[in-house]
Amino acid sequence: TGGAGFIGSHLVEKLVKQGHKVKTIVPYNINNSWGWIDTLSQSIKDNIEIISGDICDQSFVLKESKKIDIIFHLAALISIPYSYKSPKSYITTNVVGSLNMLEAAKENNVELFVQTSTSEVYGSAQFIPITEKHPLNAQSPYAATKIASDQLAMSYYNSFNVPVLVLRPFNTYGPRQSLRAAIPTIISQIVQNKKK
């Protein structure tokens, strides 16, 4: 899931280049856009099965996850500021959507479920370097939904033996990234200061 996004589009591209069969769920939209997948070369796009749909639709994800070896779950609402304005939409997409994907992984006996989380689950650092032992401390509705999703993933491992890997990336950056993210903002500020 999340193949249309910043990290997801890079993952999709890399998996195709490595010769894997790739299927991704992208949100339906009236523009018929596949997000960042639209910018990939045609030879890459020709090797991706793209399904438009909603991870909040349990029967849809259950059906589309059949005969899948690994689920890379990256789909999420990610804007921290917007999470304060619409926390329920974050719970629906980030928590219920993750639950649906975990249930699909369980029912379809996937070999591995990769839950993509965020460093935001740690809040302000209580010690550095931050390790997995750092306390979880949601400082936004977004972070709270990611903690809930991570804990659901671990519960599916503990309760149902669904093989789970939780990734918590810190400040990813690169091509296709939103200019509002931390690293592009810092770079933009440096460039602006040099022009003064």
Model-derived regions, located:
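N-terminal Rossmann-like NAD(P)+-binding domain of SDR-like oxidoreductases, especially those catalyzing
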Residues: 1-172
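Juxtamembrane helix-loop transition sites at the ends of transmembrane segments
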Residues: 47, 138, 189-195
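Generic alpha-helical structural context detector
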Residues: 103, 154, 184, 188-192
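Glycine/proline-rich active-site loop of Rossmann-fold NAD(P)-dependent oxidoreductases
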Residues: 147, 172-186, 193-196
